[in-house]
Amino acid sequence: MTLWLVRHAQPLIEAGICYGALDVAADALATQTAAQNLASELPLGARLLYSPLQRCVQLQRALQVLRPDLACQMDARLVEMNFGSWEGQRWDAIARAELDAWTQEFATWRCGGAECVQDVMTRVAAVWDEYCGQQQPTVWLTHAGVIRASTLLAQGKRHIADASQWPQTAPAWGRWSALQN
């Protein structure tokens, strides 16, 4: 099976602001462009799962107009990491001690009192386990953190020990990568 990991278009938020579970809209033109580019690439009848955050819903709706053959389903497990009290704050306004603690305990530190990276890994692994053994091509419209977690799952890694193991790259906004499973 092929798993398409698609990142939403560029969000309408000032650079340097922490947003994960914060429900920020994406640029409408960039979303439409991403949908047009993606529509011609996806196989017929693919299953499409998408995050309920509006930046992904926007892309799902634009893509569904172009590709009504896609079987679309919202899946809350595909949301970005919840940074709790950090959400909506400037990264440089978050206490240095908290950021250092996250780096030191990367897998288990609850950012802003909410999720930790291992929570995200576990949540994404549940979706992975449910769909990745099936033959139907599957598309996830999601976020960079979920895509990074998926990259680790594709390598057979369900837990990480420290920040050095977390993938540094993800597709650019409105772009995608495909994993063969």
Across the structure, where does each feature detected by a protein language model lie?
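Active-site-proximal alpha-helix that buttresses catalytic centers in soluble enzyme cores
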Residues: T2-R67
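Phosphate-handling substructures
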Residues: Q64-R123
